[in-house]
Amino acid sequence: MQCLARKDNNMTDLTRELVDAVGDAFNANDIDAVMQYFASDATFDHAVGPDAHGVRFEGADVIRGVFAGLFEKVENVHWETLDCALTATKAYCEYRRTAHHRDGKTEEYLSVDILTFKDGLIIHKDTYYKQRS
């Protein structure tokens, strides 16, 4: 998955290569590869949940469980990057997410991730996506 980034003049820490590597790990559906990019105290705010921020998952072990569960539930899931903008510490990425479930169903929707980085690791992943009705 390639980040089609617009460079921000303030960009010092975050690189397109790092964001692309995170995306590649997710697209490989490889939980160990994904988790190497998360800080131990990272948080993940899911798009859905009872709170304004959705359901919040705290800590790398909890986040690992969330994504491992996704990878186990589907044959594969792929995020196609539609656009990505970087600042010094944040990546704002638009995706087309397609999941092929083991029962033969395909799920597709548009999503946005806001990834906040510190020292080369994700400290906060905030996800938004379109709801079909």
Locate predicted features.
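Acidic side chains
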Residues: 27-32, 45, 113, 126
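A solvent-exposed, acidic/Ser-Thr-rich amphipathic alpha-helical stretch
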Residues: 31-82, 86-88
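A beta-strand edge to alpha-helix "cap/lid" segment located at domain peripheries
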Residues: 6-14, 64, 68-133
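Generic signal for short, ordered secondary-structure residues
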Residues: 12-14, 20-21, 42, 46-49, ...
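Residues at structural and domain junctions
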Residues: 8, 20, 28, 49-53, ...
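Short, low-complexity N-terminal intrinsically disordered segments enriched in polar/charged residues
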Residues: 1-40
